[in-house]
UniProtKB/Swiss-Prot annotation:
It comes from the Bacteria. This is Putative cellulose synthase operon protein C. Keywords: Cellulose biosynthesis, Repeat, Signal, TPR repeat. GO terms for biological process: cellulose biosynthetic process. Pathway: Glycan metabolism; bacterial cellulose biosynthesis.
Length: 1154
């Protein structure tokens, strides 16, 4: 157990001693250090003793061989030294020991000594770089030569630090070299490394050889310190290290004197102030020196130091005042050179400061005088010239500013303010010139205006993005906005622009996320709140916009935010009012608006409503009310202009339009209204010029109601001005601007598909779609081929009708309407006469009741009619013929004019139309040849008509028609008629693509004579003297993407009465022999009443964009009238149509039935 304990103790002791053993130098290291010490102290005996032992221990050590080499060389044994050098080259040819030894050997030769002497001469005469280049190739030998080499290197400013480090290394290796220590200490003091210098002197003082030198250098470093606590401490430190010598005596005397002086408070304050100034502590120096000056106002040194302290603090005015006093008190002071230099500097910078202040106060004349004054003080510094450049910039004298800034840079290429000034000048001239200037700058100059370079790049990207936005290339614009955001991360408005572009590109979720993230990053930033509010309100999220704005304390709201809030709140009120008005409650909507606080916007809305309902008096009064508050309100002036135009007072309208204030900042909407007014006043050229300027502006804007309205009305104007093709292109832009689509349509199918109605559309989108569709269809070329079969039962030979009509119509654009060419081929067959037992016709036709008729019993005829015409929204006319080939052919046609009075639409027309209800009335027939053989029939209605309608798009509608006609025909008794028809309908379902109605119709007819017979002189058309009917129609109309249909039915009750009329009303047509009999014959009158019904089905299908097919069937059954129809048609669209199907389908109507 004891043995175990001893072993543990031994092991522990061993472990404890191991670090000490490892840390201790080896015998070889100790002996080598003794060699270096002996060489440094010139003790050759110490060198030889150490080498003897080293060569026994480690004879092949390169450092040992090198030491022996140096020893032999010092003894003059060149051969022995060469042998050691050769041996060293074999042992360690790459070692520092060999390289150093080889250099030392070289210096022992005459050439080497001469090269060294030459290098020393170069170093002495100030050519240190050449000396170093010629010495040793950067690898000096050891010893005094190495010290001399690195001392020479230290004379090169760029390598002084390297040289000091090398000398410190040599000092560590050769601690007794007092010459080295002397040089190193002086180098450290001159490099302002005082603490390191004193440490070297303290090391040097430990050797007898170096102590006196160290004492002199140390005292020289502290003896001239200003009297202060620091100077006393420095003297005490010196005296604690050195105890004898002349310097010590002087230090002791100086210490006693300073301690005595510092006992005086005034002197102490002065001394501490002077010391603080020397240390650069102006804040501490100023109160101390002020105290000293108060104690002795004529103390020039204190005044000068106080001026210096103020200069250090940047207080140029006080610096100048105190320095001037110091120089005046003691013009011959040893400090005069310093004070004069400081005075010049502070006078210069005082003038610069005052010039900057004058420029900031917008007083360029005073600034110019001060900068010129500074320039007179010092014409070598660049800032006075820079100031003159700033004055020229303030005066917008850019050429002069450019010259001054360029002069500034010639004086000081590092003056970044001059670089910035030139960059701003060139930026104003053109971005390209600014970029070229920046590219010419040095790296440091370029870094100084990095913000301008980024801004230029940002501006360039912004312009490129805007150009892409104008072209509708939103995704590409967004990519550029991302680059802008990378240059200016967190920018509110770049984020806003990027989000808007993404939204338009269809990346709406990403756009919303960007704006939400911005709000989270800058929750209390008013600019962010304003931008996000704009973003939300611009995408129909007004309530969300208000909620976000209200998250910011009201005290932080900017004027822009308040204006946005007012607009959004006003929008909500106006939205509610507009809904009320659109639902027919205009009075209630007006009442709600009049309850709101006074608002120009609301007053203008009320005025606009009055104008739309043609209440010009109320509209004028409302607009004048606005102008009373705001005499230059453009909307009110334009409103009065529109009132005068609507009232037909063009002179007053022109006068009002001339009152518009001239401005370059008029809104798009104001300019749009001006253009419309110009167009309505007939100033087409002016309107064209206004729209030519407006339309590109609107295209360049992000989608908005304002830009969409400009493009919509611009397209209308272009169409009216005779450029429908361009108008259609503008409608495509209007679709983007109004939000119908985010991508501009590139082909007809896409474009026309976008014209389809959408229940979610606001009034603007709905209008853009509708107007674009109307113009597109007006410009399309259509060809329609239709076959119609119709007939009604009756008496064979004249009223048992079966008719076929084949119609071909071509519609094409002309002016602002559509012209058409029409041809109908008509075949009418009224069957065959019945006969009695004798083969005679048993019918009341022609003159067969006066003389029997027999022979060919069938009656039919055919012919072709042609017609041309034109129509637009207001006028319609046509001219054509009845079927050529019939017995009676005439020219027919009509003209009509349509307009509205408020919600009441009306159409007036004048016409000449055939009566086509029978072969006799339409085409005429020919009496039996053996009787008279005369043609008669072909009845035409010449007259006028008025149609009225009231339908505001709501649930109820009313229509009415009144017409009067003169009825004439070939060999037919003249007649006239008056017809009144009216109806009411209720829309059970009233949707864009589906409508179900039920109504009540009434008809009242009156014919002067009953000429419904088929005998010679009769007309063969239904002509009761009284006719009254009531009907209840039900109609279902619907359309889908490629189908459209109408299903209808009605039940009716009618009453009619006819008078007894002569069977042969025109006796001149009857042969004389038959007239007496003819006069006795008549057609009995009478009355009847009964119920009837109708059923109708109409269907159309879009097969392709260009081809459409349709069919219809119509069955009618009523008292005295029961025609039925069946038709098929095909229509071709040259341009193609993918818009809404017609609702209901629109087959051709036989020209005879117009």
């Amino acid at each position: 157990m004891r043995k175990f304990t001893l072993n543990i103790f031994t092991l522990s002791l061993g472990l404890a001693v191991m670090p000490m053993v490892e840390a201790a130098p080896t015998a070889q290291q100790q002996l080598l250090e003794q060699v270096r010490l002996g060489e440094a102290t010139h003790r050759e005996d110490l060198v030889q003793q150490s080498l003897y032992r080293l060569e026994l221990i480690d004879p092949n050590n390169p450092d040992v061989v090198a030491a022996r080499f140096r020893s032999l060389l010092r003894q003059g044994d060149i051969d022995g030294a060469q042998k050691q050098l050769d041996r060293l080259s074999q042992l360690a040819p790459s070692s520092n020991a060999y390289k150093s030894s080889r250099t030392t050997m070289l210096l022992s030769t005459p050439d080497g000594r001469q090269a060294l002497q030459q290098a020393r001469l170069q170093a002495t005469t100030g050519h240190a770089e050449e000396a170093v280049a010629n010495l040793f190739n950067g690898a000096p030998p050891e010893g005094d030569i190495a010290v001399e080499y690195w001392s020479t290197v230290a004379k090169i400013p760029a390598r002084r630090g390297e040289a000091i480090n090398q000398l410190k290394r040599i000092n560590a290796d050769e601690p007794g070299n007092t010459g080295l220590q002397n040089n190193l200490a002086l180098l450290l003091f001159s490099s302002d490394r005082r603490d390191e210098g004193f440490a070297v002197l303290e090391q040097m003082a430990k050797s007898n050889a170096g102590r006196e030198g160290a004492s002199k250098i140390w005292y020289g470093q502290i003896k001239d310190m200003p009297v202060s606590d620091a100077s006393v401490s420095a003297l005490k430190k010196y005296l604690s290290i050195f105890s004898d010598g002349d310097s010590v005596a002087a230090a002791q005397s100086q210490l006693a004197e300073q301690q005595k002086q510092l006992a005086d408070p005034a002197f102490r304050a002065r001394a501490q102030g002077l010391a603080a100034v020397d240390s650069g502590m102006a804040g501490k120096a100023i109160p101390e020196l002020q105290q000293a000056v108060r104690a002795n106002p004529k103390d020039s040194e204190a005044l000068g130091a106080l001026g210096q302290a103020y200069s250090q603090k940047g207080d140029r005015a006080n610096a100048v005042a105190n320095l001037e006093k110091a120089l005046a008190l003691d013009p011959h002071s040893s400090n005069n050179d310093k004070w004069n230099s400081l005075l010049k500097v502070n006078r210069y910078w005082l003038a610069i400061q005052q010039g900057d202040a004058a420029l900031k106060a917008n007083n360029p004349d005073r600034a110019e005088r001060l900068f010129q004054q500074a320039r007179n003080v010092d014409n070598t510094d660049s800032y006075a010239v820079l100031g003159l450049g700033d004055v020229a910039m303030a005066r917008k004298d850019y050429p002069a500013a450019e010259r001054y800034y360029q002069q500034t840079l010639r004086m000081d290429s590092g003056n970044t303010n001059a670089v910035r000034g030139l960059a701003n000048i060139y930026r104003q001239q053109s971005p390209e010139k600014a970029e070229a200037f920046i590219a010419s700058l040095s790296a440091s100059q370029r870094r100084s205006i990095d913000d301008i370079e980024r801004s230029l790049q940002n501006d360039r990207l912004a312009q490129q993005a805007e150009a892409l936005e104008n072209q509708g290339k939103w995704a590409q614009a967004a990519a550029l906005q991302r680059q802008r955001l990378a240059l200016d991360p967190g920018s509110v408005w770049i984020t806003y622009r990027l989000s808007q572009d993404l939204w338009q590109a269809g990346q709406r979720s990403q756009a919303d996320t960007l704006m939400r993230n911005l709000a989270q990053q800058k929750p209390n930033d008013p600019e962010q709140v304003y931008a996000y509010g704009l973003y939300l309100s611009g995408h129909d999220q007004d309530r969300a916009a208000l909620a976000h704005i209200n998250s910011l304390p009201r005290a932080q709201w900017s004027s822009n935010i308040q204006e946005l809030v007012n607009r959004l709140q006003s929008d909500q009120v106006l939205e509610t009012a507009n809904r009320l008005r659109e639902s027919g409650k205009e009075a209630e909507a007006e009442a709600m608006l009049r309850q709101q606080p006074p608002s120009t916007r609301i007053d203008l809305t009320l005025a606009d409503w009055a104008l739309q309902r043609r209440d010009y008096t109320a509209a004028r009064a409302a607009y004048q009310n606005v102008l009373t508050r705001e005499p230059t309100n453009a909307d009110a002036i334009l409103g009065l202009t529109e009132v005068d135009i609507a009232a037909g007072d063009t002179a007053a309208a022109r006068s009002q339009l001339a009152k518009l204030p001239a401005t370059d900042n008029a809104s798009l909407n104001t300019q749009r209204r001006v253009a419309l007014a110009q167009a309505q006043l007939g100033d087409t050229a002016a309107a064209q010029q206004t729209f030519n300027k407006l339309i590109p502006q609107a295209k360049s804007q992000p989608p908005s109601m304002e830009s969409a309205m400009v493009l919509r009305d611009g397209a209308k104007f272009e169409a009216q001005a005779g450029d429908p093709k361009q108008a259609l292109e503008t409608y495509k832009d209007a679709m983007v601007a109004s939000g119908v689509t985010t991508t501009r349509p590139q082909d007809n199918d896409t474009f026309t598909r976008l014209t389809r109605n959408d229940e979610k559309d606001d009034w603007l989108k709905r209008g853009v779609r509708s107007d674009a569709a109307d113009l597109y269809r007006q410009q399309d070329l259509n060809v329609t081929l239709e076959h119609d079969y119709w007939g009604s039962s009756g008496t064979g030979g004249y009223s048992d009708l079966k008719a076929h009509t084949t119609m071909l119509q071509v519609d094409a654009p002309y002016s602002d309407g559509r012209m058409f060419f029409r041809s109908d081929f008509v075949n009418m067959n009224v069957g065959s006469f019945s006969t009695n037992a004798d083969g005679k016709w048993d019918d009341n036709w022609g003159t067969c009741t006066l003389r029997d008729c027999s022979g060919n019993r069938s009656q039919s005829d055919s012919g072709a009619s042609v017609a041309v015409g034109w129509r637009n929204d207001v006028w319609s006319w046509d001219i054509g013929t009845t079927p050529m080939g019939f017995n009676v052919v005439d020219v027919v046609g009509g003209i009509s004019y349509s307009d509205d009075i408020g919600p009441l639409g009306y159409t007036v027309n004048a016409h000449r139309r055939p009566i086509s209800s029978s072969l006799l009335a339409f085409g005429g027939q020919k009496d039996f040849p053996s009787n008279t053989g005369k043609k008669w029939g072909g009845v035409r209605a010449d007259g006028v008509g008025l149609s009225l309608s009231y339908d505001k798009g709501e649930a109820n509608g009313v229509w009415a028609s009144l017409s009067g006609d003169q009825l004439t025909g070939k060999n037919v008794e003249d007649n006239w008629r008056v017809r009144w028809m009216t109806g009411y309908y209720y829309k059970v379902i009233n949707q864009n693509n589906r409508r179900v109605t039920i109504g009540l119709n009434n008809m009242i007819w009156h014919y002067d004579k009953d000429l419904s017979g088929y005998s010679l002189g009769q007309g063969g058309y239904y002509s009761p003297q009284e006719y009254l009917s009531f009907a209840i129609p039900v109609m279902w109309r619907e359309r889908t993407e490629n189908w459209s249909w109408e299903l209808g039915a009605s039940g009716s009750w009618s009453h009619s009465r006819t008078k007894t009329m002569p069977r042969y009303p025109l006796m001149n047509l009857i042969p004389t022999d038959w007239q007496e009999e003819a006069a006795r014959q008549s057609n009995d009158g009478g009355s009847s009443q009964g119920f009837g019904y109708t059923a109708r089905a109409l269907l159309e299908r879009r097969v392709t964009s260009n081809w459409f097919v349709g069919t219809a069937i119509d069955i009618q059954q009523a008292k005295d009238y029961a025609p039925s129809h069946f038709l098929l048609y095909v229509r071709y669209s040259a341009a193609g149509w993918q818009g809404d199907m017609d609702l209901p389908p629109q087959p051709l109507i036989p020209y005879a039935d117009w």
